[in-house]
């Protein structure tokens, strides 16, 4: 069949009038115009005046994290740099601290709410990173939350291990040791 548009072709959007979409087992099986094919036991949904599109894929999320950093927006709007925000106790390290303190249940509940909201906007698949634990037990905790959500939520999740998001505060004086930890301890335990 035809493949997806690439390059400049992506900008050529095609609208079909009097179109139909046949979905079998949750997957688009065929699309056409004119008379709707007769399929035994099919449910017909009148989508006139609506957009029909495949599920959206969010290919870059930081879904699993503790705390909130909304106060940093005000700081940014007042001209503060990331380094100034970090030195004031914000930035990724503040999220790391909150993520480490959060329970599996807290992380899962927060992420599930975000997934529900994303589904409401048409997203059906997300890539979800670890990367705010920055210690073996906490990175594995985040990946376990992602796995559990993938097993029990309607959203499809694809996990990405991001244990080297940054060098955490406790390793600032010994970056090489943190790289060793990621390579020799964390990565072998990621499944």
Language model features by range: what are they?
Residues 1-38:
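N-terminal metal-binding scaffold of metallo-dependent hydrolase/deaminase domains
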Residues 42-46, 159:
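Conserved beta-strand scaffold positions in the cores of enzyme catalytic domains, especially
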Residues 18, 41, 49:
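Phosphate-coordination loops involved in phosphoryl transfer and adenosine-cofactor binding
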Residues 47-110:
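Metal-associated gating/positioning segment near the N- to mid-region
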Residues 21, 26, 49, 60, ...:
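Divalent metal-coordination and catalytic microenvironments
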Residues 93-110, 116, 124-191:
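Metal-coordinating catalytic core of metallo-dependent amide/deamination hydrolases
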Residues 33, 49, 164:
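Residues that form or immediately flank small-molecule/cofactor binding pockets and catalytic motifs
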